[in-house]
């Protein structure tokens, strides 16, 4: 007996993509970030990560809407991942002006998203390792509210 899923309901059970938003999983993000940090160290480039935190009271539909806004706001070569239930990250790569790219991404999301969210970004030239970059992103002192700036 063959069971078929309705068209338009993709499922992912391979831990490569998040099954709810279909963005990359945390494992894929960590691997990509390690590669980009190594590349930045070798080539003298910068790598940037922007973290977005959606409020705890956001519904499932609002999370999907935010995930879609991220997808529309990024450049083709950037990578979106969902780290936790309410945390998304965007890996900005292949850009000489990473700081400006971080600012532009946040501004594009602010223009589309009416609800409040928090964000932070961290930049590395390869001298900061994966753990240092992630700790910097988790520092609540650098988290900004979308309504305060």
What are these regions (language model features)?
Residues 23-45, 68-72, 140:
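Short regulatory alpha-helical coupling segments
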Residues 48, 82-93, 112-140:
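A short glycine-enriched loop-to-beta-strand structural element that forms part of the catalytic core
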Residues 1-19, 23-38:
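Signal-transducing coiled-coil linker helices
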